[in-house]
Regions:
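Conserved small/polar residues in nucleotide/adenosyl-binding loops
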Residues: 8, 18, 22, 212-215
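Short glycine-/polar-rich loops that comprise or flank the Walker A/P-loop
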Residues: 35-36, 123, 138-141, 180-183
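Helicase C-terminal subdomain and adjacent C-terminal extension
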Residues: 151-215
């Protein structure tokens, strides 16, 4: 299990990492996860669109992460045990599923075979849900997509917090952390997230720990 204190994200056996560039290298995500039990992948800020509760860029990052985990786990991949995805908005669920379908076609093509159908079914059966509705048990990998693109959306994202030992703790992030058996992967835009105290501490910890800038 993750050795993590909820209030401070003190990770004696874990490290936060902020490398968007790993997505552009072969097996970069897998190498990142081999070194880090908790990872934060910085996504670029998305411009204005009509769909305020979706984030296509984050969906594509999550899909790339899913496909690299899927490839690295090979025959041991279990849709009920390996990956769970948590997002704040239901609209983002379909966006992520479509991105996973597109990433699958890019990786494996459109060949119609029993093997391909079985692989697609495994990916379609991955649990993707909101924090409020997520009823899944623990997964080896939990991917938490923040989705938000504007500061005002942080009010919804952080509307459920509690105090413990004088620290404000975000319940939604806490749920994601408690569902991660081996790895917690967070995807979000640091420029927006840093405007919240809790998320700012998380990202600053990542910078100080790895001496890297958030991109």
């Amino acid at each position: 299990t993750l050795n993590t204190q909820h209030s401070t994200l003190n990770t004696q056996h874990s490290t936060l990492n902020t490398q968007h560039s790993t997505l552009n290298t072969p097996n970069g995500i897998v190498r990142m996860l081999n070194a880090h039990r908790i990872a934060f992948i910085a996504s670029p800020r998305v411009g204005n669109t009509t769909a305020m509760k979706t984030n296509q860029v984050e969906a594509e990052i999550i899909a790339a992460t899913v496909m690299q985990i899927f490839s690295s786990t090979a025959d041991s991949f279990d849709e009920a045990q390996t990956i769970g995805i948590i997002v704040p908005y239901r609209n983002q669920i379909a966006t992520i599923r479509n991105a996973i379908d597109a990433a699958y076609r890019t990786m494996f093509g459109n060949a119609d075979s029993k093997q391909n159908e079985a692989q697609r079914n495994k990916l379609h059966n991955i649990t993707i849900d909101t924090v409020e509705r997520y009823q899944g048990s623990q997964r080896d990998y939990i991917i938490y997509g923040f989705t938000v693109r504007h500061p005002y959306q942080l009010r919804f994202l952080t509307n459920n917090t509690f105090e413990e030992d004088g620290m404000r703790i975000d319940r939604k992030l806490n749920v994601a952390m408690t569902r991660a058996r081996l790895h917690l992967i967070m995807v979000g835009n640091p420029e927006v997230l840093q405007q919240d105290e809790t998320f700012s501490r998380l990202i600053n910890f990542a910078k100080q720990r790895d001496r890297k800038s958030v991109v």
